[in-house]
């Protein structure tokens, strides 16, 4: 469920005043994740790496309350749930968008992920949960390694967005550079940093 709230009644009141009409209110953080454990678990359990990373992203986000509030247009919207978006190549060879509702239960999330990414790939129709859930956008550039990405401010979508390329092997460990973009009205750097730390911790905890 989504509902409009008064910014003055929230901890984001001053940020709303400062950043809602800024020319570029988006901030990008870069972080290199150690994904060694995630790769080992995905291979051992025959699970998709990107599905598991999306699950960890959702799990890391629910621990930061700022993820449940998002500036939409000139309004501040409160959400009860979080979903993770993934980009799917459809049968026409083009890309479609698929939102997956976050569930704390990995098996439930996996089933939803497999069901709806296959459905979107076959139909080419986007699956949009933004009316009810705060969406975390993701994009995996699987054909190449990238160091990061900036300048993803559309002026329309204010959702947090994470992008990554191919992971890299160094010795016996695997690393994945990511870019995390967020709207400064939604959260401050400390909140973004906490999310990224949560993300690394969730990756390490996967079994």
Residue ranges of model-derived segments:
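Gly/Ser/Thr-rich phosphate-binding loops and adjoining beta-strand/alpha-helix segments
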Residues: 2-8, 20-52, 70-84, 135-138, ...
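Histidine-centered acyl-transfer/condensation active-site motif
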Residues: 130-143, 160-197
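Domain-scale detector for complete catalytic domains at protein termini or as standalone homologs
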Residues: 1-13, 22-24, 36-37, 58, ...
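Active-site cores that bind ATP or allylic diphosphates and position pyrophosphate for catalysis
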Residues: 147
